[in-house]
Amino acid sequence: LREEVQELLNDKKNLLTITYFKLQKLLEKKYGNNAVVLMEIGTFFEVYEVNNDEEQIGKAKEIAELLNIQLTRKNKSILENSQENPIMAGVPAISFEKHLARIIAEQKYTVAIVRQKGLPPNVSRYLDTVVSPGTNFDFVVDQDENNITSLVIDQIRGIYLVGYSAIDVTTGKCYYNEIHGTSEDKFYALDEVFNYMNMHKTNEVVISFADKNINQKEVIDYLELKLKTFHIGTFRPKINYQNELFKNVFRIESLLTAIEHLDMERVPLSTESLAILIDFVIGHDSNIIQKLSFPQKLDVSRYIYLGNNALEQLNVIETTHNPSLIKLINNTSTAMGKRLLKERLTHPVKDSKEILRRYALSKELFDFHAPIENELANIYDIERLTRRIKLTRLHPFE
């Protein structure tokens, strides 16, 4: 993608507005209709749109309404809008991050940020980063996880098999599992994946179908993906590519292959899913894929099975219609505590020894909770701060 974008930006034969719409079409083709290009021009970041009888492209009006800024035309003296004289809106570069945070907070848009470098007349432009709901690293406003998930769906005689992987880009945690349905319950794998996405808050999904005969609409509706940002992937990485990718990303030095080193040789759908996911994130921002934790298998055998969408039906997690149990009982003092509370409620263990250990620990600390809470209230989100330090993305004010 970056090479294609740079090739368009280097073409000086076209007007900049025409180049902008070529970029917009390229982004929409790759990421869907909610893609938008924000381009730095002088001291402003601008967004363009054409809306006439012949063509409709761009999101200037939509973004202007969201940010409550004035919509105009490139040349106000010409009433008609076109690619040469588009509808436009812009924000000052000095306040760009504030407005970008507002766009990202919608949990809807995939934003391509094109920046400029150099001084006139030797100004050039480049794709800085692509920010989407699942790859949002710098503008997270809540304390929940921010997972981007990849699913590879296959089927054998109508029985679904799913490779699942997820990355929380804000903490660097990485999860995977492979689930197979049964002849008694052909949708078991889809039910499990639906639970995973509720347990690990998922803002964006890349879904790939290994069998062209799969009813894609049935799967998308079953997993309620239309309520999230999702993309249907076509990239099917070969095993050699997967090994090389994992070796570089996880910095593996071993006589074993990278997949063997990660103990994932028995879950081919999961390794493919993880490779697709990492490749997708690199396409947005290659820096945030650095220093990931090793993939952790979701050991479902430790937990009570929650079928039939139990977490939603019991209002453990929040839905559009009802508040959640988590919200009701959340009196934690730190972001890490809130995430742990959610993990405990959505992953009920069945090991009696572990349950008794937790009870004993709670009883032991109960009389000291007030002074401990006062200290905890002053602790920042260490998991995310540590991740930002590792990636040298920590701001001084943090």
Regions found by a protein language model. Name each.
Residues L391-E398:
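Short secondary-structure subsegments characteristic of cysteine-rich extracellular domains
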